[in-house]
């Protein structure tokens, strides 16, 4: 059994990766809204915080009654209770959304990574 899975993510307005990759610790989606389009609802979560990473374009984020401008290169974290909705700007918007249970991160990067010496690629 392989220790990895690969999924195609091209040419879809929304791709959810939980099922495609059998994710067990987070939900990841890639979302694209055309020019001036909006998510058709406001939502919050019961447990999951969300991290949005804007890949292309710009738009507006309605969050708890406030509207803020968002654009390429920005990352936005929202608590589960935050009431949110995105609207694309005149050039559309493409973003990654990562959901995970608030407060669940116990190890990360240097505290979770382990250097492996018994196998390596040809370029090392």
Predicted regions and their residues:
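Conserved short histidine dyad/triad with adjacent acidic residue
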Residues: 14, 29-45
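Short, charged/polar surface micro-motifs in flexible loops or helix N-caps
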Residues: 24-26, 34-38, 58-60, 101-104
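A short, N-terminal "cap"/entry segment at the start of jelly-roll beta-barrel domains
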Residues: 1-26, 108-124
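Glycine- and acidic-residue-biased ligand/ion/polar-headgroup-sensing regions
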Residues: 47-49, 53-59, 64
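Short histidine-centered beta-strand/loop micro-motifs
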Residues: 18-20, 40-45, 87-88, 107-108
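Well-ordered beta-strand scaffold positions
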Residues: 26, 66-68, 91
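Ligand-binding loop in jelly-roll beta-barrel domains
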Residues: 80-105
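Short acidic-glycine-tyrosine-enriched beta hairpin
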Residues: 65-81
């Amino acid at each position: 059994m392989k220790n990895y899975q690969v999924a195609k993510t091209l040419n879809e307005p929304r791709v959810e990766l939980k099922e495609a990759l059998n994710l067990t610790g987070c939900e990841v989606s890639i979302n694209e809204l055309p020019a001036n389009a909006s998510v058709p609802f406001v939502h919050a979560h019961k447990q999951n915080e969300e991290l949005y990473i804007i890949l292309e374009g710009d738009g507006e984020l309605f969050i708890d009654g406030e509207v803020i401008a968002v654009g390429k290169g920005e990352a936005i974290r929202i608590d589960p209770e935050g009431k949110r909705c995105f609207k694309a700007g005149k050039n559309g918007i493409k973003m990654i959304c990562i959901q995970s249970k608030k407060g669940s991160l116990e190890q990360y990067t240097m505290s979770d990574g382990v250097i492996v010496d018994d196998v390596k690629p040809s370029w090392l």
